[in-house]
Amino acid sequence: MVYTSLKSPDKDYQYDLHIAHLYGDLMNTYGDNGNVLMLKYVAEKLGSRVQVDIVSLTDLFDKDLYDIAFFGGGQDYEQSVLAKDLPTKKENLADYIENGGVMLAICGGFQLLGKYYIEAGVRKINSLSI
């Protein structure tokens, strides 16, 4: 179930910004929550109400709902876990990206959007090829 992890305080804002934090409960090895907090902070300073949703295992990525998608880094184990779920989101993610959706992918998130990556243990993990 998609859940909201961060939300701007209630007040008048000029804009609304909806951010998907892909697998934010699993992919946060290098402090990627800090990246999301900075996106929220800067957007609020520029007059945007911000809502950040964690889109994780078994959740639908609604390509029409999000203004920005963020996909952070993770350890090999977490990447191998979500690599099994990621194909269920491929069509919507590909459509989102190929039609001008904003995606900030870092480290493992970037790898998982490519063709494949090789774990430290030499195992090949197939990715989305977007």
Model features per residue range: what roles?
Residues D76-I130:
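Cysteine-nucleophile active-site neighborhood
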